[in-house]
Amino acid sequence: MSSPIRIAVTGAAGQISYSLLFRIAAGDMLGSSQPVILQLLDIPESGKVLDGVLMELQDCAFPLLTDIIVTHDPMIAFDQADIAILVGARPRGKGMERKDLLQTNGEIFREQGRALNQVVKRDAKILVVGNPANTNTLITMKNAPDLSPENFSGMLRLDHNRALSQVAMKLNQPVSHIRKMIVWGNHSSTQFPDLSHAEIDHQKVIDLIKDQTWVENSFIPTVQNRGAVVIEARGLSSAASAANAIIDHMRDWIFGTRDDDWITMGILSDGSYKIPKGVIYGFPVVCKNGGRKIVQGLEISPFSRTRLDIAYDELTQELDSIKHLLL
């Protein structure tokens, strides 16, 4: 059996982690033969809840779970971690936009970036989930200057999965048949779920739907606003679906995307698709051998261009308000 992989998870006492940790320990993320060590971080106020999560993980008797470390110190949680999943953040409540969380959560991710810079493995894969995820990814990255930008990504996989699901329901097709979906931009209501390149069995989804009104007036706003609708229905933000998206994101990043397909990942812009450098932006990427590359050469229509730029403009506004948190 392989040596254990160390996985740090922040916000370990929270809702998303409660849906995530047991799946990681069961092998859903790294496979049925890969042992893991969970290094769990949360704030001291979460104490008894985190103790309860620890007891439940122990009581599952997972064969792959070699050890569990519980701490309130990011230096301990991130020490020699191979994977760091940064879930912990102040949650978004009813009527609250992600931009309202920028200041509070920005401080959290600055501290965690500095800790990662000191103690995480140099080839670690670091996924930022806590909102606003794109800008928090940049804050974390900028406060870990000894690590490569290739180490970091922000999660747009939940948005990507939501888009796949809407198309699958519309066309009464299995989700697994849909390829080449993209969600451009920010993990916020300005994101642009883009069907123009999506395919089912080598047929263009847009040609199968034949309803641009549905695309513009139903599909796009449904995906953009799904998080807020879930909060309205549950009284809490998406948890199980977010945990599932984390599993999907990390599995594809580590083991590679399937042939003739790509995924959406928030990564540092390199100027592709006329998105200026310096922001974490949702791009279509392919993953291979543990790395990722932006898919190049896709045609961007005027309709799409407008929406790509709207998302970029929002990200620059977010950055303007947290510049003091960047190194």
Swiss-Prot record:
It is an enzyme of class 1 (oxidoreductase). NCBIfam families: MalateDH-SF1, PRK05442.1. The keyword rRNA-binding does not apply. It catalyses: (S)-malate + NAD(+) = oxaloacetate + NADH + H(+). One of its GO terms (molecular function) is L-malate dehydrogenase (NAD+) activity. The gene is mdh. InterPro entries: L-lactate/malate_DH (IPR001557), Lactate/malate_DH_C (IPR022383), Lactate/malate_DH_N (IPR001236), Lactate_DH/Glyco_Ohase_4_C (IPR015955), Malate_DH_type2 (IPR010945), NAD(P)-bd_dom_sf (IPR036291). The active site is at residue 187. It comes from the Bacteria. It comes from Nitrosomonas europaea (strain ATCC 19718 / CIP 103999 / KCTC 2705 / NBRC 14298). Pfam families: Ldh_1_C (PF02866), Ldh_1_N (PF00056). Belongs to the LDH/MDH superfamily. MDH type 2 family. The keyword rRNA-binding does not apply. Substrate binds at residues 92, 98, 131, 162. One of its GO terms (biological process) is malate metabolic process. Gene3D superfamilies: Lactate dehydrogenase/glycoside hydrolase, family 4, C-terminal (3.90.110.10), NAD(P)-binding Rossmann-like Domain (3.40.50.720). Keywords: NAD, Oxidoreductase, Tricarboxylic acid cycle. Catalyzes the reversible oxidation of malate to oxaloacetate. This is Malate dehydrogenase. CDD domains: MDH_chloroplast-like. Its EC number is 1.1.1.37. NAD(+) binds at residues 11-17, 105, 112, 129-131.
